[in-house]
Amino acid sequence: MSVPKAKALLTVCAALLLCGCGQALSEREIVRAVFFARQQGAYSACLLLADQNAESDGVQYKTASARGDTAAQALHLAEDALPGRLYYGLLDLAALPPGCDWADAQTLGTLLYDKAQPAPELSVFVLNTADHSWAADAASLYEDMKAVEQEYALHCGLQ
């Protein structure tokens, strides 16, 4: 193989790698936060997503949630409820269930760790025991938690 052909082949390979063969962010479901709850031995997971199709100004959100026997099952069922590919690269908040012990926190952290890459920082909160309607409360919980971080200059993230 001559040098020009090898160079051309390498150029084509590099172009294919860098051309964005995947979907653009505007075509993906962008996950901003994940909330976990545990009730009666079952887990529920709620994904708070940036609603890129909202027509009003400002940040708009939508949710997808599901219940499962384990946190992983609940998370996967919530993901499967969405039509597009998920993008966790902008995930910046996770909320753990009330009464979460260290072992549960490690399990949930491991579950999110691979998905959240390359998120620069992931803040972790523990929910209180109040009942939550994910569809109604997830966006306000997220905004309240982010406001607390900013107001009190909290830095409770995993980097």
Predicted features and spans:
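Membrane-proximal alpha-helical signals and transmembrane carboxylates
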Residues: 2-14, 18-159
